[in-house]
Amino acid sequence: FDEFGRRIFTMMTNRGKLDVIQGITELTPQFTRVQGISHVWDMRLATTSLPKETLHKVLLQAAGGTPDVETRKRIARFLIQMGRYEDALRELETLLETPELSENQKNDLQQSVRALKQLSARRLVEELRMRQKAGQYQTVHTLLQKFPTEGIAGEILQEVKELLGEYEKKSVLAQDLLSKLDSLIQTIDETPTRQLCSEVFKEIAADLTPDTLPRLAAFAQLADDQSLPPEERVALAISGWCLGADSALRRLPVALSLYRVRGLILDYLNEEQVLKRQEILERLRSEEGATARYAAGILAHMRPPKPLPEELPQKSGCFEIAVTWDSKEPPAHYLVQLPPEYHPLRKYPTIVTLHGLQTTPEQQIDWWAGEFDNAGNRIGQAGRHGYIVIAPHWTQDQQVNYQYSAREHGVVLAAVRDAFQRFSIDTDRVFLTGHFSGGDAAWDMGLAHPSLWAGVIVISGRSDKYCTYYWENAAHVPFYIVQGELDGTLMSDNARDLDRYLNRGFNVTVAEFMGRGRDPFSDEILRLFEWMSYQQRNHAAADFTARSMRAFDNFFWYIELLDMPPAVITPPTSWPPRNPTPLVVRGRIPSQNTLLLQVGAARTVVGLGPEFVDFDKRLNVTINAQRVDTRDIQPDIEVLLEDVRRRGDRQHPFWAKIETATGRVSGRKP
């Protein structure tokens, strides 16, 4: 836009290039109305999406064009209403230098400047708290030390002082605990035991952060208790480090066994050969700490098992990784952008973003995390909020639309599961997103695999084909749909399914932009992050009903389908189906240790975890009104580790599994 709020919008039509002259006709702190001058077109933009320089020029011209006292005051008021306190403050400070101001005017302006400084300082404190919550401790500590003090209220400065005090307190506590632990280790008589304890100590000292410090809470409580032998206090530190403070133990042999078990688990998860995995498993079974309960705790508190590749040159925290999704197909690739101060022992929320057919994975990461600056760092919303961004390259050359295929699902799911093994991802906060055809894919994959996602964000995407039959699956995964009023037939195409969602009270948010067409909608990004902050995956749904029509849409929470009947399967190449009959899967957990399942496949695998099963009590599982024999079901470390190898979820692995026939028709060929 120029200073008069006009621009030329150029688009390609079937008649060639078309230039549309537009002008800003209404400017509010929330939205900007833009209308066509040469053509009929009425659209809305978020005012925050206008560059600061452009906004200032337009405001100045709208207020009369002359930067006099009243004009600058009007601009400052507008900026305050937008929440841009720093910009308003600069405007008023510039105004104070105007010689024609009277003393009363200067006093009034100085009072406004003081109030703006408080608002700006308060928002800076809120920003620092958000960055602290995102794990950016060094950045926050540095900014707290440089926090402006001139003209800032004592209440805010006291809050800053308390935040700095928390840092100093944690730093002193960490050094004190390390010193005490080191001293206790040196009192252990047995040399091999002392050496192994020293090895663990070096790891703790290297990885002790504000996120890992709570693991030593049990040790901190009893570190000075002289009634406990040094070995027991050391055991509290080592076991707490491996399992978390709530599971800390006093027996040093068991604590050291946990440390060895963790190393063997790491070897197991990285070993590709079955025979070698069995050898590792035998060594594991000889360890006292190799129970399913201990192994689950270790998995939840260990580093990701697979190593990181080399960073891309001059691109901080950015990686490109190849992943095998099918042994008969060439590897697929995906990009990953890590947030600032990433640490492998902290869990991070994650965005899985799918590009359109005319865009790239790099552009998707740029949209969420910002572009690289000259220093090779990104300054964008994903890093600010502490999110990992994953962008699979899911399309093929010359592809013209989303194909709803096994290949597309396989590439995306393989990238996600490989990322689980390499990066410290909070598997309860993984969000699937997509633009354009990537939005079509996100809508389909979100409904096909609702148990994987904390939420699904579709931007300029379409609900089509399988989505029409899977719509009830949306009851179990939140959706955020962003679309433009003038994006062809998109709104009418999506209307039926959106009506179904909204009329039944599903957790669905729909943002429709007036006068906007096929657009990436970058002006919605702050609302998207606010929405994501409230969402979390239901990893063990107590009551769900889901539908499937493809052989690869075969897992829902703790149920996996095997041998689906041919009558319900409709491959994408056979669309549309003649007689669509989706397979129905129902799971209900009315009480602990009771599972009531309805499964339309011939065989099923039921995963069992501690969230809904107490393995010390009798287990009741009913499938299709038939009781399943569960007398021999016990937690098994091999089942647990194989589940982690396959699904990558180290936060909620299954401790045991039941594989059984269901009495339904088999999909196998004779």
Where are these regions (language model features)?
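Compositionally biased alpha-helical segments
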Residues: 1-210, 636-670
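A domain-start/cap signature at the N-terminus of enzymes
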Residues: 175-348, 638-650
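Gly/Ser-rich "nucleophile elbow"/oxyanion-hole loop immediately N-terminal to the catalytic nucleophile
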Residues: 340-346, 400-436, 448, 452
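Active-site machinery of serine-nucleophile hydrolases
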Residues: 347-350, 354-421
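Primarily recognizes the serine-hydrolase "nucleophile elbow" in alpha/beta-hydrolase
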Residues: 421, 428-475
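Short beta-strand/loop motif that positions the catalytic acidic residue
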Residues: 474, 480-483
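C-terminal catalytic histidine-bearing segment of alpha/beta-hydrolase fold enzymes
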Residues: 488, 492-593, 600-603
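C-terminal beta-sandwich/jelly-roll accessory domains of carbohydrate-active enzymes
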Residues: 550-670
